[in-house]
Amino acid sequence: MKEQKLIHEGLIIESLPNGMFRVRLDNEDLILGYVSGRIRRSFIRILPGDRVKIEVSRYDSTRGRIIYRLRNKDSND
């Protein structure tokens, strides 16, 4: 059976080497996010200040996979 993952929205705070990013979730948690393969293949640029959807494992809540970059009109600010 596949592992259940939690999907959160957050803001990219800092860009780190090797496609890693520091992300502040909407619930104020600070986690380390990495870019999913689909985003990497599509050459989608993620920059500090972007809002993203991030998939977090139940077992390790300090790391997550960035699965979607929200456009300005998609964010609920």
Swiss-Prot record:
Q: Which GO terms describe its molecular function?
A: ribosome binding; rRNA binding; translation initiation factor activity
Q: Which Pfam family, an example, fits this chain?
A: eIF-1a
- Is Ion transport one of the keywords? no
For this UniProt entry, what's an example GO CC term? chloroplast
The main location is: plastid
Q: Which domain of life is it from?
A: Eukaryota
Q: Gene3D superfamilies given for it?
A: Nucleic acid-binding proteins
Q: Where in the cell is it found?
A: Plastid, Chloroplast
Per UniProt, residues of the S1-like domain are 1-71
Which keywords annotate this record? Chloroplast, Initiation factor, Plastid, Protein biosynthesis, RNA-binding, rRNA-binding
User: How would you summarize the oligomeric state and partners of this protein?
Assistant: Component of the 30S ribosomal translation pre-initiation complex which assembles on the 30S ribosome in the order IF-2 and IF-3, IF-1 and N-formylmethionyl-tRNA(fMet); mRNA recruitment can occur at any time during PIC assembly.
Write out the similarity annotation: Belongs to the IF-1 family.
The task this protein performs is described as: One of the essential components for the initiation of protein synthesis. Stabilizes the binding of IF-2 and IF-3 on the 30S subunit to which N-formylmethionyl-tRNA(fMet) subsequently binds. Helps modulate mRNA selection, yielding the 30S pre-initiation complex (PIC). Upon addition of the 50S ribosomal subunit IF-1, IF-2 and IF-3 are released leaving the mature 70S translation initiation complex.
Which protein, by its recorded name, is this?
A: Translation initiation factor IF-1, chloroplastic
Q: Specify the taxonomic lineage.
A: Eukaryota, Viridiplantae, Streptophyta, Embryophyta, Tracheophyta
Gene behind the chain: infA
